[in-house]
């Protein structure tokens, strides 16, 4: 009788221990996966460039970030519109800055509304991976607020003194979307000379030291009106030295 009691006690204890172990095992929570670090892009820009003299329009992209090996851009509809992947040494070392220009078709050949529809307004997502396996990302708001081209002129005051002037810009070009235009800067380019000035400035005197280096004859220049959205419009001009 004693041995039967002892056996029963041992069996009950073993059962209790087994139950305890089973419950302990079931109650142990799963360890959550470690989140992948996210690195922000230093620069993520997408913008229109319209040449009012040539009547062509295209989309430019500029981005900058540390040591990425893969990157893609999605439009507001979540469609991938651009993708780049490094190979060989670029897969191992990564890339940083990237600037590219899309083709700029003439609006005489590609209707404006068709081109605008290819690149809808809204938020464009930039996302990729660094060489360390981290996520790198950024976003940019893309607008159809495209400024008109300024009226430009150039005056050669003396052989080495050149003044370039232009008109204010407060509206889009005729036929473009009726968006609010807020020009924040103008940029002047004369061959290798380049300067950017606030929107309140409407003329630039090109340094005579630079003008002196130009050969006699006709030379081209550009004035860009740059909107707060980042979109910009070029007007071309020329002068004779």
Where is each model-derived feature located?
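Recognizes extended acidic, P/S/T-rich segments that occur
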Residues: 78-110, 180-214
């Amino acid at each position: 009788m004693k041995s039967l009691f002892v056996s029963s006690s041992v069996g009950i204890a073993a059962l209790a221990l087994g139950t305890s172990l089973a419950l302990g095992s079931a109650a142990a929570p799963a360890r959550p996966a470690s989140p992948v670090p996210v690195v922000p892009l230093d620069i993520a820009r997408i913008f229109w460039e319209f040449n009012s003299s040539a009547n062509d329009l295209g989309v430019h992209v500029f981005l900058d970030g540390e040591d990425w090996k893969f990157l893609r851009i999605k439009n507001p509809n979540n469609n991938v519109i651009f993708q780049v992947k490094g190979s060989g040494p670029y897969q191992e070392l990564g890339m940083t800055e990237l600037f590219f220009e899309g083709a700029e078709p003439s609006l005489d050949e590609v209707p404006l509304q068709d081109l605008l529809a290819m690149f809808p307004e809204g938020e464009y997502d930039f996302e990729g991976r660094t060489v360390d396996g981290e996520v790198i990302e950024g976003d940019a708001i893309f607008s159809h607020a495209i400024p008109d081209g300024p009226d430009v002129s150039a005056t050669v005051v003396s052989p080495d003194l050149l003044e370039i002037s232009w008109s204010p810009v407060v509206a889009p070009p005729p036929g473009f979307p009726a968006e609010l235009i807020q020009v924040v800067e103008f940029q002047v380019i004369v061959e290798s000379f380049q300067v950017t000035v606030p929107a309140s400035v409407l003329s630039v005197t090109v340094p005579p030291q630079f003008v002196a280096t130009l050969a006699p004859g006709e030379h081209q220049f550009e004035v860009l009106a740059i909107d707060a959205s980042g979109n910009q419009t070029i007007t071309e001009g020329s002068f004779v030295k």
